[in-house]
């Protein structure tokens, strides 16, 4: 529990790890400001660590500080521009902040680096849906369900995608493949 972590003697740990553990514990107690203060201490020890910045942004997201989270994720992306996890978090923050076009671009970039993240695929489907591209939302949802082994659900969404996408296009072919595999 958070109270145990905050009360524990931690002199043997590095300063940044102590600060990180306190930040997480404080965030679980709903003390965002104090949690962010602890993260700043950790970042002072390791200022170029993109994952400390990612955690900072994630805590902002969990507390619905979407605009601040976007800014924090931009710093993390600057430190690790090819990291799919950080890109996905940035895309999620953009989506939550209603920056749909930027979210779609960022989430597609993240997907090009890691196509197996079901959380990323869920966010990408939402971005497509909010961009008025329901056929692409259906395709990405079908992919996500197929990756999860939920072939019946994948079939439903692949069929929707096949019906809405231009026949013969790469996206249509992918939807057709998922539909074919999921009907067996």
Where on the chain are the PLM-derived regions?
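Extracytoplasmic and endomembrane cell-envelope/extracellular-matrix remodeling and assembly machinery
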Residues: 1-78, 106, 136, 150, ...
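Generic low-polarity alpha-helical segments
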Residues: 25, 141-144
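Alpha-helical adaptor scaffolds
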Residues: 40, 50, 54-135, 139
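Hydrophilic extracytoplasmic domains
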Residues: 82-88, 92-104, 108, 112, ...
């Amino acid at each position: 529990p958070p109270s145990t972590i905050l009360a524990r003697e931690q002199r043997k740990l590095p300063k940044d790890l102590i600060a990180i553990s306190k930040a997480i514990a404080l965030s679980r107690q709903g003390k965002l400001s104090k949690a962010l203060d602890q993260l700043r201490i950790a970042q002072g020890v390791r200022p170029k660590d993109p994952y400390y910045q990612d955690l900072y942004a994630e805590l902002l997201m969990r507390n619905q500080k979407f605009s601040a989270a976007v800014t924090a994720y931009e710093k993390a992306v600057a430190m690790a521009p090819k990291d799919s996890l950080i890109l996905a978090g940035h895309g999620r923050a953009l989506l939550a902040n209603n920056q749909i076009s930027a979210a779609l671009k960022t989430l597609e970039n993240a997907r090009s680096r890691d196509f197996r993240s079901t959380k990323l695929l869920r966010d990408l489907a939402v971005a497509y849906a909010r961009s008025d591209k329901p056929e692409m939302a259906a395709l990405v949802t079908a992919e996500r369900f197929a990756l999860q082994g939920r072939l019946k659900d994948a079939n439903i969404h692949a069929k929707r995608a096949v019906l809405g996408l231009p026949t013969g296009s790469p996206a249509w072919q992918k939807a057709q493949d998922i539909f074919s595999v999921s009907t067996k």
